[in-house]
Regions:
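Feature of Fe-S/electron-transfer and energy-metabolism proteins
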Residues: 1-242
């Protein structure tokens, strides 16, 4: 009942941002973006939107995966595909609001790519690397505010946990084993086996710990999901703990 109440609140709030009748600006502000000046860009955008009295939310999101081109700004405007701009500074940010959000000039010189297929602007799927990607775990990264649970739930978040709580723990482990899911570390250890070992360990009290620095030393490979979509991690831990 509590989840359904949360879901009924979250979905309309997310749909407000998906509303195609107004512009929405997203700013990548994970560690990679902040190191390149994303917080200053975020503030410049908010100041310009406020100065011009525009109904245009400016939202802080996580890492889209193109760290080499930070700071990234995504603008969704009616009549245009969602457009991602790279290496944005405060001057460019103000220009994007003036010329594109308020006007009709997409500012092609700053465009990195479109987030959807269209006939106007090359999309990310045309990139040699991105064309082969199908994001699953990282699908929300760079598209939602990681600090807003409504954004996560509005995109189907915690639905898997709700389903899992209606199953027996043994049944969940069986499903994970059948899926072939493996850990994200270098060993690729089967997740279902790991859960089964933990479940069979002696003692009633058990602990589930998140290793926030998995992978190659110093690479911080799990940064993206920790910063950009933490509720995905929390949902997985809740299912594993159950």
């Amino acid at each position: 009942a509590a989840f359904q109440e949360l879901k009924s609140r979250a979905e309309p709030r997310w749909q407000e941002l998906e509303d195609t009748t107004r512009s929405v600006i997203l700013v990548g502000a994970a560690t990679c973006g902040r190191a390149a000046g994303a917080r200053e860009v975020l503030q410049a955008l908010r100041n310009e939107v406020k100065k011009r009295n525009l109904d245009c939310p400016v939202i802080e999101v996580g890492c889209l995966g193109h760290c080499y081109a930070e700071p990234l700004v995504i603008i969704r405007k009616p009549g245009y595909p969602a457009i991602c701009y790279g290496r944005v500074n405060t001057v460019i940010a103000e220009k994007l609001v003036r010329d594109f959000v308020l006007g009709d000039d997409p500012c092609y010189e700053f465009i990195l790519g479109a987030l959807e297929e269209n006939d106007l602007i090359p999309s990310f799927t045309d990139f040699p690397r991105a064309g082969y990607e199908k994001k699953l775990i990282l699908k929300n990264c760079g598209h939602i505010d990681p600090e807003q649970i409504d954004h996560y739930v509005g995109n189907g978040g915690y639905a898997a946990l709700t389903k899992a709580l209606q199953m027996e723990p043994v049944g969940i482990i069986e499903q994970v084993n059948k899926s072939g899911l493996r850990g994200r570390g270098g060993a690729g250890f089967p997740t279902g086996q790991k859960w089964q070992i933990c479940r069979g360990a002696p003692g009633r009290l058990k602990y589930l710990i998140c290793n926030a620095d998995e992978g190659d030393p110093g690479a911080f490979m799990d940064r993206a999901i920790l910063e950009s979509d933490p509720h995905t991690l929390l949902e997985g831990m809740l299912i594993a703990g159950y």
